Amino acid sequence: MPADFTIVIPARYGSTRLPGKPLLELGGKPMIAHVCERALEAGAAEVVVATDDARIAEAVDGLPVTAMLTRTEHASGTERLAEVAERRAWSDDTLVVNLQGDEPFMDAALLRALAEALGRREDCRVATLAAPIHRPEEIFDPNVVKVVTDGENRALYFSRAAVPWDRESFAEGAGVPMPGMPYRRHIGVYAYTASYLRRYVDLEPSPLEHVERLEQLRILWHGDRILVVPVEGAPAPGVDTAADLERARRHLSGRTP
């Protein structure tokens, strides 16, 4: 597969918790501009902002990115990516990284590493990231999604539950896994081949994704493989709530003179 990759940033205007989230101000510019900068730092051959609102497209005018107005009815960012791939007529082996529009502090090096890892594998058409869990309480936190892989770093399952279940330690109520047990948290950034994006839109939702509220389980349910790329640390969290926005502003003001 080619070494070049494209980054698509799906950015909806509507948000239950933070309406107009991509346009909210961070350090004197809209959040979506920060996300575009992270994508450009990764060295992508092309960066596309896929949005359902002209105001978001206007916010990135002047940046070396392509803004594309997409349909409003998409149920997920992945479906929005698939529309972009189809309209741009990307070849089947084009590598496409999905960077959410509320990730202003994403590590650009992780985006490149993700795309490069997928490009080296012939057995997977989807890849994502995972980092070690160091705090035992996170194993039981349903907001921390865990991932279990096989010996080739292909995902076996994603869950909000404590997986793998340490039968000895957890049954005794210790709440601390056996030393050396490799618990990993999923980092919700994905890379796909354009051919897989075209396949994805034809897949029926699965019971597992409805129960866990994890879209990636649809891929496993239909027998497809997800490469899980191990990284040492998780990036700073994205912005989902008003409290997250204030934290992001404090983080940025502390980093910027």
UniProtKB/Swiss-Prot annotation:
It is found in: Cytoplasm. The keyword Cytoplasm applies. It comes from Methylococcus capsulatus (strain ATCC 33009 / NCIMB 11132 / Bath). PANTHER family: 3-DEOXY-MANNO-OCTULOSONATE CYTIDYLYLTRANSFERASE (PTHR42866), 3-DEOXY-MANNO-OCTULOSONATE CYTIDYLYLTRANSFERASE, MITOCHONDRIAL (PTHR42866:SF2). It is an enzyme of class 2 (transferase). The gene is kdsB. GO terms for biological process: CMP-keto-3-deoxy-D-manno-octulosonic acid biosynthetic process; lipopolysaccharide biosynthetic process. Its EC number is 2.7.7.38. InterPro entries: Cytidylyl_trans (IPR003329), KdsB (IPR004528), Nucleotide-diphossugar_trans (IPR029044). This is 3-deoxy-manno-octulosonate cytidylyltransferase.
